[in-house]
């Protein structure tokens, strides 16, 4: 635009609505959110959603709320038309979801919309809207309630369309949104049909516990701790995840303030503070918490999508959270004495930074390297595995370089080759072996995977399971064979031998969890990041001595893929 033509002018209504749509409507899930909130505000107790193409093709939301007259529809598609407030001060005592009156006109401006609605004893009407303007309106009977169909989302804003994610990512976003709605409301029937297949069907009489089990998984509910604490005007209720079910991100946290799904870094920090002494570093608790506060204490008008919240009286709210959660965890968790891990030796532990070895007493003498024995109860010995074992036995004293086990000492294993004595750091070595076995894609017999005799099962949320289902072929190529046995669980049929069963389950959950939300990350990067974050055991009993030979065969690396020290020579300076 030239300077001569840059006159100040009023924007036309179509442009204004499309700009508003850019703030309110981020993707198909944003449309679903606005429409179901309108249905809830209309008093509906039965809401059904249908989506095609992840929502970009079609979104249909039906409800049995109070409905509208034809003249109300004409007003509803205009900006700032709302039945929720009449003055600005009303915002601070809201009990409804929507109140700006921007959503419906914003959606209508970037889609082809149809509104079919009727009030009790009303005639009913059907209105067609394109580019935010009504095209036609006709009488059309129906039961009381409203059906809004949104077709060809973003059809007239190609730039916005080009920035949209895949239909699969949109479906995952819609699922999380609907799961939050299921958790935040009771006595409401929810149905979701995606790509003509029913994904959710929640009855009115399904209680909060059943709904949490559906969303978070039965394993979460079975191990979670109930919390119910009242303090003056505050009420905290919900489920606290067992400390053993910690996650690598905060995405396992569901928070509802006054029945609205929100994100609050303040509340997340306070919950983490209560869990702090029970979780490893950089791990986060999972929870489903409902907090009721006086309406004037919270401002949901921070973000156009109303997912962020500002809170007054943070001191009082924070104190309640820490006190109530700490009390539950202390009474329900094992004592500290029970959780203590006894050291394997009296000698001081060896850290990566230096060696402190007052006396070295070998706890086992080197024996011919053999197949991993600590997994023999779980893995079935196949012909391929027997061949691998034989091969490893033959390679126990390789022509290139001999290596033998000397001793286990704290978190390290001491081994000897022609170069001298090496300190082998168990945690880093196992993590590196597991990671490169995934990269090898079964091409290297030294890193071959093994089948489970009795496949263990891993349970997660339905959202995470749906993501994992899309990556089964990629995982199988890496030696992780999974079979979906229920909507929220998988059986693990094979895996590399370098990871223990519980670690493997934790990694698969972390992979599914982060994959469902880190939509901009490649699968290869996702695998690397989740392996890097995984807390492998430092116990030397988790490291089979045959793996020493494997490490030497692949070049006895000094550093793992993430830069962590795998081994280093024991020098005279270490004893001085």
Swiss-Prot record:
GO terms for molecular function: ATP binding; ATP hydrolysis activity; ATP-dependent DNA damage sensor activity; mismatched DNA binding. SMART domains: DNA_mis_repair, MutL_C. It holds the Pfam family MutL_C. One of its GO terms (biological process) is mismatch repair. This protein is involved in the repair of mismatches in DNA. It is required for dam-dependent methyl-directed DNA mismatch repair. May act as a 'molecular matchmaker', a protein that promotes the formation of a stable complex between two or more DNA-binding proteins in an ATP-dependent manner without itself being part of a final effector complex. HAMAP family: DNA_mis_repair. This is DNA mismatch repair protein MutL. It comes from Chlamydia muridarum (strain MoPn / Nigg).
